[in-house]
Regions:
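Nucleotide-state sensing region of NTPase/ATPase domains
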Residues: 102
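Gly/serine-rich nucleotide phosphate-binding loop at the start of the catalytic core
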Residues: 1-91, 96-99, 107, 117
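Conserved subregion of the PPM/PP2C metallophosphatase catalytic domain
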Residues: 108-112
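Active-site gating loop/helix substructures
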Residues: 117-159
Length: 159
């Protein structure tokens, strides 16, 4: 592979390799097992957020306070994910841009362990993640990571 001509797109499957939580497990844990079956995970998230039965999340007629609490719990659960051999192999690829739907910072942690340091980031967006990225560098090799669904460092960005 030639450097900087390729992009890697990845999601939670990398975390599942090392027995990290998948979305269904995470939502089941957060909702104390009360998720709806046979509906997409996105709707399960909304159901937990809006549920009258999930009293710790539902704080009124709108979802916003409940959703903030839900995002906080998701971020706390995902902050304990550790890297694995797949992340190390991914970080060693001659690729500049990594696009991820993951909220966790596992690739960033892996890069730091490999001697990379953060040289730039843009996380000015408070709600969405269109321009949210971090750049890491080691020996003139740069890696730019885009969290397109938000990240646990900016919990409100989680979508």
């Amino acid at each position: 592979m030639e450097t900087n001509k390729n992009v890697i797109f990845f999601g939670n499957g990398l975390n599942r390799v090392s027995e990290g939580l998948d979305w269904e497990e995470l939502l089941r844990k957060i909702s104390h097992g009360q998720i709806l079956k046979d509906i997409p995970l996105t709707f399960q998230y909304e159901d937990i957020c809006l549920s009258r039965d999930a009293e710790i999340f539902d704080k009124g007629p709108s979802c916003s306070v409940g959703e903030d609490k839900l995002k906080e719990v998701i971020a706390d659960e995902l902050s304990v994910i550790h890297g694995n051999d797949v992340y190390e192999a991914l970080a060693k690829l001659p690729v500049k841009h990594y696009i991820t739907t993951n909220y966790d910072m596992t690739l960033e942690s892996t890069l730091k362990k490999m001697g990379y340091h953060k040289i730039q980031s843009d996380s000015n967006e408070s709600r969405y993640s269109i321009h949210r990225y971090s750049i890491f560098e080691k020996d003139n090799d740069t890696k730019q990571i885009w969290h397109i669904h938000g990240n646990i460092d900016k919990r409100n960005s989680i979508i």
